[in-house]
């Protein structure tokens, strides 16, 4: 059974000292919802937390809007501290579409273009951290299904980029993403099964 012990020093050193909760949603100029922001490694802000109902836990909603966002923003802090191999940026460098990413629609529409989510198509840094966030918050079956439905070219691009991501996390930070995923999914199950009482969290 995996534990967080190997990562204690890392998390204590780099986890933001402030996690800021905003009850209402935030929006970009293009109308897309902002799920979270990271500010200089010191603060992570999560929006729309008034939608969380501790008496009726929807683990899929928590995963999409909060857990995945936390891993996304924390990954930004890591690469801002120690940058990743710039070869990652060149793999799909001509496919990034900036603020028009939302026009891609559902994530599965991005898979065949070599991206794990539509938002990953906005720019290379977002692409990099989306790989981490999606991998550790979803099951192996989800990941394999994504690769299967990405088609030959999309699958090859995702695998090529993820190899750099996986190596970066392991060699730079000593984080094994498979082990971290086991921990994250176990704790998600604890919440979904009522083994964590969210109503007493202050």
Positions of PLM-derived features:
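Active-site-flanking segments in enzyme catalytic domains
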Residues: 19-202
């Amino acid at each position: 059974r995996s534990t967080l012990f190997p990562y204690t020093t890392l998390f204590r050193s780099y986890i933001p000292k402030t996690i800021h909760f905003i009850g209402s949603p935030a929006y970009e100029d293009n109308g897309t919802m902002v799920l979270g922001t990271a500010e200089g490694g010191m603060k992570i802000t999560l929006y729309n937390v008034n939608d969380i109902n501790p008496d009726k836990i929807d683990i899929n909603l928590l995963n999409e809007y909060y857990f995945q966002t936390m891993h996304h923003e924390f990954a930004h802090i890591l690469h801002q501290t120690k940058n990743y191999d710039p070869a990652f940026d060149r793999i799909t460098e001509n496919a990034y579409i900036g603020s028009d990413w939302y026009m891609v629609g559902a994530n599965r529409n991005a898979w065949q273009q070599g991206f794990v989510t539509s938002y990953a198509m906005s720019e290379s840094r977002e692409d990099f951290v989306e790989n981490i966030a999606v991998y550790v918050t979803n099951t192996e079956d989800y990941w394999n299904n994504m690769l299967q439905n990405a088609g030959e070219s999309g699958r090859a691009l995702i695998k090529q980029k993820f190899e750099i991501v996986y190596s970066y996390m392991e060699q730079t930070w000593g984080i094994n993403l498979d082990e971290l995923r086991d921990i994250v999914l176990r704790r998600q199950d604890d919440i979904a099964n009522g083994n964590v009482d969210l109503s007493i969290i202050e």
